[in-house]
């Protein structure tokens, strides 16, 4: 009788996992498998259930039904500590570091002594190409560097199952390449990786297997090579809206009491004029933005884009230079006064800086108005405002008093945009608006930003995704090491040129300025 070799069990097997929140079904009898040395990509629209499933596997949430097995052995009553002991580690989409502890303390936090090896930490940092100061507080890092620290925490734990939730959302292409090299090294050691991403080219580059979630279930699963990009997109968003916002959505979206009177809408005077501005992380910055223009701000992490945005909003002091908003010098104004004057900032980190996670949705959407009007709230008015933006932006939620933290990432981002719009901006600074947002919600946000510009709002658009910068901007300023390395517009505005300029090459190409630029045909150039 021939001898048969038993097939080893999967590294991870999830069977029949279901979950409800307040009677709402978010996971429907999910089956999910991860083999040793495999990258299993998980795709899905915002609210599809990806994060809930991963939190159950990581012991953060208990399932209502179903079984989790690791190497063929059932895992009962999982907690985060127990999951870590078993070798399961979740790197969250939003960094969850201890802001007051140093980078090194965060990486080594609660590590067993046999794993808290500083030499190993130094080698891993070298492999990732990280040049972080380990002594600085984690709260002082940019989001991309915080993400790398979170990844380091997982790598230091010798995890057998590494769950990466949007790990490259804030990373540069070079940082992404180094991370992927490190992942491939782990795969050779038999580590299994669950890779959650909305970047389909990355999934094709890295993942052996792909599963697509929709409405709490698995809509598609199989070898990545067997599916086209269109197959994956259709499985995620079979009824996704395509094209521009509908007329009714635009009607709901119209800014309340638009600050820009019709008589001034055609003014050639810039909405904002920045002259020789210097501050922490940048120097000698000069540019202007017209009404209705989308000005892209590109550069690698550390180029000074976020520092510039925070200085324009008044969160950081300027050392020299002037900022003129609608012919008023606001350089010395406090943030509250800049907000009242019409300068609104949508920050990069929506959870840490943009939204009050434990406050109700209705309160959040009017939060900037609260800043101007005091703490007295008007629940009926807040409810009406939230309903208006729900219709305009397709925000999905169960009830008005629902805490923000219960929303999916894409719906949180839409709520943050609604909050900024309710402040009635003249100038809207948008920092990484689609970080961690799915394909469908990303398209919604693009159309939304264009619709805002059509209402003669000036927009500064900051993004690490160079393709979306080219797609969205009328002009692009490229920053390198805290300075503007050049301005691009028209045919010169392409990913390759921007990338070279972001790394210090001088390729600035501009066309004669055409004044207000609110469409692709009216792209200004002078900075």
Curated annotation (Swiss-Prot):
One Gene Ontology MF term: ATP binding
Chain sites annotated for binding ATP: 44-51
Predominant location: membrane
Cell membrane in keyword set: yes
Function: Part of the ABC transporter complex LsrABCD involved in autoinducer 2 (AI-2) import. Responsible for energy coupling to the transport system.
Name listed for the protein in its UniProt record: Autoinducer 2 import ATP-binding protein LsrA
Gene responsible for this protein: lsrA
Primary enzyme class: translocase
GO cellular component: plasma membrane
Listed SMART domains: AAA
Subunit structure: The complex is composed of two ATP-binding proteins (LsrA), two transmembrane proteins (LsrC and LsrD) and a solute-binding protein (LsrB).
């Amino acid at each position: 009788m021939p001898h048969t070799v038993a097939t080893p069990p999967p590294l991870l097997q999830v069977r029949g996992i279901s979950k409800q929140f307040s009677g709402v079904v978010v996971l429907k009898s999910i089956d999910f498998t991860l083999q040793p040395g495999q990258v299993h990509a998980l795709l899905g629209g915002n609210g599809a259930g990806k994060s809930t499933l991963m939190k159950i596997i990581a012991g953060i949430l208990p399932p209502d039904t179903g079984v989790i097995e690791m190497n063929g052995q059932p895992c009962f009553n999982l907690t985060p500590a127990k999951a870590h002991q078993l070798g399961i580690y979740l790197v969250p989409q939003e960094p969850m570091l201890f802001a007051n502890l140093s980078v090194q303390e965060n990486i080594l936090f609660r590590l067993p002594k046999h794993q808290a090896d500083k030499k190993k930490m130094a080698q891993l940092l070298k492999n990732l190409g990280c040049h972080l100061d380990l002594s600085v507080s984690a709260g002082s890092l940019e989001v991309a560097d915080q993400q790398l620290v979170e990844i380091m925490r997982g790598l230091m734990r010798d995890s057998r199952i590494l769950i990466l939730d949007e790990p490259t959302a804030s990373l540069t292409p070079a940082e992404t390449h180094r991370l992927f090299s490190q992942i491939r090294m782990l795969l050779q050691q038999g580590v299994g990786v669950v890779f959650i991403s909305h970047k389909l080219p990355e999934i094709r580059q890295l993942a052996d297997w792909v599963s697509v979630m929709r409405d709490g279930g698995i809509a598609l699963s199989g070898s990545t090579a067997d599916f086209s990009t269109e197959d994956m997109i259709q499985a995620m968003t079979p009824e996704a809206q395509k094209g521009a916002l509908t007329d009714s959505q635009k009607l709901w979206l119209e800014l309340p009491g638009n600050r820009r009177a019709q008589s001034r809408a055609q003014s050639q005077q810039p909405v904002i004029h920045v002259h020789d501005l210097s501050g922490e992380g940048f120097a000698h910055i000069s540019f202007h933005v017209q009404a209705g223009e989308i000005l892209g701000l590109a550069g690698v992490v550390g180029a000074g884009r976020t520092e510039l945005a925070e200085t324009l909003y008044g969160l950081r002091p300027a050392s020299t230079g002037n900022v003129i908003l609608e012919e008023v010098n606001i350089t010395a104004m406090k943030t509250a006064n800049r907000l009242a004057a019409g300068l609104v900032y949508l920050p990069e980190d929506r959870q840490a800086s943009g939204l009050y996670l434990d406050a109700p949705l209705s309160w959040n959407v009017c939060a900037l108005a609260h800043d101007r009007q005091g703490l007295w709230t008007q629940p009926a008015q807040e409810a009406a405002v939230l309903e208006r933006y729900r219709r305009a932006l397709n925000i999905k939620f169960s009830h008005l008093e629902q805490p923000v933290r219960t929303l999916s990432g894409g719906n949180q981002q839409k709520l943050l945009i609604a909050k900024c719009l309710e402040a009635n901006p003249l100038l809207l600074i948008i920092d990484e608006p689609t970080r961690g947002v799915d394909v469908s919600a990303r398209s919604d946000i693009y159309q939304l930003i264009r619709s805002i510009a059509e209402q003669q709002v000036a927009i500064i658009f900051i993004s690490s995704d160079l393709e979306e910068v080219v797609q969205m901007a009328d002009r692009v300023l490229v920053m390198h090491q805290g300075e503007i390395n050049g301005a691009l517009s028209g045919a010169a505005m392409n990913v390759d040129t921007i990338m070279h300029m972001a790394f210090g090459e001088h390729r600035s190409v501009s066309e004669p300025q055409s004044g207000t630029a609110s469409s692709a045909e009216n792209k200004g150039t002078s900075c």
